[in-house]
Design a protein with these regions (language model features):
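Intrinsically disordered, low-complexity non-transmembrane regions of multi-pass membrane transporters
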Residues: 1-19, 23, 74-88, 202-213, ...
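Juxtamembrane and boundary regions of transmembrane helices in multi-pass small-molecule transporters
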Residues: 2, 138-153, 169, 173, ...
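Alpha-helical transmembrane segments and their helix-start/interface "positive-inside/aromatic belt" motifs
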Residues: 14-22, 46-52, 80-88, 148-153, ...
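Hydrophobic core segments of alpha-helical transmembrane domains in multi-pass membrane transport
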Residues: 24-37, 51-61, 93-100, 130-141, ...
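Transmembrane helix-loop junctions in multi-pass membrane proteins
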Residues: 32-46, 66-74, 100-115, 134-146, ...
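Transmembrane helix-loop boundary segments of multi-pass membrane transporters
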Residues: 46-47, 65, 112-124, 142-157, ...
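Helix-loop-helix junctions within the multi-pass membrane cores of secondary transporters/permeases
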Residues: 78-80, 87-158, 336-417
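Transmembrane helical segments that form the transport core of multi-pass membrane transport proteins
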Residues: 243-356
Length: 516
């Protein structure tokens, strides 16, 4: 065990640099705003800075931990299920995994509290069932080779059809649920399952089908919540603004964070437990992994646990109040339009601090053998999230319905999926669920809510929906990246015969005569 920990130290230093590169730009933007056009109290500023430090250390531990534990666990379970060639086992285990992972997701409790007209346990069980069913569908799609765009057309048509019967006050919360339930705990494991399943297939489309699980798992919660909204006539949602902290000295600052720490210690333990138990059962029954590999996975799980606890503590206690207060200050100024470019700038950088984005970018680079680099993927995600936050701020300032953005956005994204290479489509729809993680929920959403309070808007209809917008735009930007790559490849191929002819002519002697 000591050897494993020592060997991981160089990797921790590497992950620390990555975390600093992700979080420092956000901290710099907020500090510039605080010392210029959006003054905040020392309490909020100190909480934000300590929160940023915890997020940096949290990302460092989580990214290495997920690489050492969640990814190999998911890949081995996925490979084992595929090798079994037992359809009933795949369906049963797939549903159970989706259900248990989702039911323990901390953000699902937050979503349930926002919809008082639906009993909490009813909503949680329904959403978990939705994820379980759609994870099974995702497995079957991969095994049967069903094109992802075909399924997306059917499911999103059903979503927008149901949306016509749901009270407008409930729409934004319902669409947010798709991003909320694919959190940093579930995404790495689910994506690794997909890689494990496709690795057993030997056909040429196996790599294309490595992704797409998160895409379909994001559909289940939206459908489940929309159906509940119709059944329970959920015309009301609630909003509890975050408490703005007041600390007098450094001791009170530490007490504020240490009091919240036990909550996240318990939440992450609850989230991690079903995955560990399921993997333990697979290990005893079928996997039989050697002790050294198990030790590495165990150390990785500890890193993952420490990382997520630190990350969520820093994000919820440090970032959430700062985001809300900044939104109120910026929205209360005469030049409210500044919310749009500032929101876009923050959105561009904040997605780089999403824990699961690191896992996605790394898996994309590995599965494509470097054809899609982590840097290229990150740039496409940043552009998408930047656009989505800008549009979200337009909604806050104008009160435009979220459907005016979601319907054209999804229509365009699904339309181009029929001409874009399959792999890019699957990655794009996975990226939507990955990008809308805890940083969106704890900073971007409070920023929009604070601005909405300042402009006197309806928080439930105008501010909620940021998560849904963030989940939508990467579908477009990543696929456009794929379309550009495809056009470049075609252009290069068409130019190749001309180059070959030129080379042939160059080899001929000067006095050669070619008769036509």
């Amino acid at each position: 065990m000591d050897t494993i920990i020592r060997s991981s130290l160089p990797k921790l230093r590497e992950k620390l640099l990555e975390a600093l590169q992700a979080v420092l730009p956000i901290a710099a933007i907020v500090l510039i705003l605080c010392f210029s056009i959006a003054p905040v109290s020392p309490s909020i500023l100190l909480c934000f800075l300590l929160g940023a430090a915890m997020i940096i250390v949290g990302i460092m531990f989580f990214t290495l931990g997920a690489e050492m534990s969640m990814t190999p666990m998911g890949e081995r379970v996925g490979s084992m299920l595929t090798r079994s060639q037992n359809l009933f086992l795949i369906i049963g285990v797939g549903f159970l995994l989706g259900f248990l992972i989702t039911i323990s997701e901390p953000d699902l409790q937050v979503l349930a509290n926002q919809v008082p007209s639906i009993p909490n346990m009813t909503l949680i069980l329904s959403v978990a069932t939705g994820v379980g069913i759609f994870l099974v569908m995702a497995f079957l799609r991969m095994l049967l080779g069903i094109p992802l765009p075909r399924l997306l057309v059917i499911f999103y048509a059903a979503i927008f059809l149901l949306a016509a019967f749901v009270p407008k006050e409930f729409l934004a919360v319902a669409f947010d649920s798709g991003g909320v339930t694919t959190g940093p705990m579930t995404v790495p494991f689910i994506m690794a399952l997909g890689v494990g399943v496709s690795a057993i297939r030997s056909d040429r489309h196996a790599a294309d089908d490595s992704f797409g699980l998160v895409a379909l798992c994001s559909v289940g919660p939206i459908l489940a919540v929309l159906i509940l909204g119709i059944v329970f006539n959920a015309s009301e949602s609630s909003y509890l603004p975050p408490v703005i902290p007041e600390v007098g000295d450094s001791v009170e600052l530490w007490q504020l964070f240490s009091e919240g720490l036990p909550t996240y210690l318990h939440e992450i333990a609850t989230s991690l437990l079903p995955i560990v138990v399921m993997f333990g059962i697979f290990q005893l029954v079928a996997l039989h992994i050697d002790r050294r590999t198990l030790g590495r996975i165990g150390v990785g799980l500890v890193y993952t646990y420490i990382g997520l606890v630190l990350f969520l503590t820093g994000a919820n206690i440090g970032f959430m109040p700062a985001g809300n207060y900044l939104g109120q200050v910026l929205g209360g100024q005469s030049s409210r339009w500044l919310l749009i470019p500032i929101g876009m700038l923050i959105g561009y950088f904040i997605v780089r601090a999403e824990p699961a984005v690191y896992v996605l970018n790394k898996q994309v680079e590995e599965v494509t053998d470097g054809a899609i680099s982590a840097g290229t993927m990150g740039a496409a995600l940043s552009a998408g999230v930047s656009l989505s936050v800008g549009l979200a701020m337009v909604r806050v300032l104008t009160g435009i319905s979220i459907l005016w953005f979601l319907i054209p956005g999804y229509l365009f994204a699904i339309s181009i999926s029929f001409v874009v290479p399959k792999l890019y489509t699957a990655i794009a729809f996975d990226a939507g669920g990955v990008a809308s993680g805890p940083m969106t929920a704890t900073f971007l959403l409070p920023l929009a809510q604070g601005a909405c309070i300042a402009v006197g808007g309806n928080i439930v209809t105008d501010a909620f929906g940021v998560v849904a917008m963030v989940a939508m735009t990467p579908l477009i930007t990543v696929q456009l990246m794929g379309l550009v790559a495809q056009l470049k490849t075609r252009k290069a191929r068409s130019a190749q015969p001309l180059l070959d002819t030129a080379a042939l002519l160059a080899d001929l002697p000067d006095d050669a005569i070619i008769e036509l």
